[in-house]
Amino acid sequence: MSRIGRLPIDVPAGVDVKIDGQAVTVKGPKGELSLTVASPIEVKLEEGQVLVTRPDDERESRSLHGLTRTLLNNNIVGVTQGYSKGLEIVGTGYRVAQKGAGVEFALGFSHPVTVEPPAGITFTVEGNNKLTVAGIDKQAVGEVAANIRKIRKPEPYKGKGVRYAGEVVRRKAGKAGK
């Protein structure tokens, strides 16, 4: 058995889990998320716990077992606590500003870069060089944060660019002068 897959998922108070065939819907105080479970995996709700089981020890079943359990757990944590990812903007003249629901970046380009949040994602700007991406879907929060970082990745010589909060950027020595 998968060490992760066999662990039961506790369903906290205020969270409603509905299992309809291969579709699992999780409803909580922050919103609603759904997941389509791959065919060999079975999901059961017993005594306030969600159990994920597999019918056999085939390679596909083994690989999907732990994955399905983790995705369901991420959904339950998402609708109760939510997820957030912090970004820092480093560099002279590099800044971020809130523009309605979206944000506008000045990152050394000839034009400002505007990013609008997809459904279920919110942006919070602290100061002019810190941004927090928040939402209930862990995958969507990480993807939006990665797309923002991709606009201007931290460069290795001065470290300028958009980086995750707490990210350590490997620095290189500049060229040796005479």
UniProtKB/Swiss-Prot annotation:
One of the GO BP terms on file: cytoplasmic translation
Keyword rRNA-binding appears in the UniProt entry: yes
Gene Ontology MF term list: rRNA binding; structural constituent of ribosome
Superkingdom: Bacteria
Keywords: Ribonucleoprotein, Ribosomal protein, RNA-binding, rRNA-binding
Signal peptide residue numbers: none
Subunit structure: Part of the 50S ribosomal subunit.
Protein's job: This protein binds to the 23S rRNA, and is important in its secondary structure. It is located near the subunit interface in the base of the L7/L12 stalk, and near the tRNA binding site of the peptidyltransferase center.
Family to which this protein belongs: Belongs to the universal ribosomal protein uL6 family.
Protein's name in the database: Large ribosomal subunit protein uL6
Organism: Leifsonia xyli subsp. xyli (strain CTCB07)
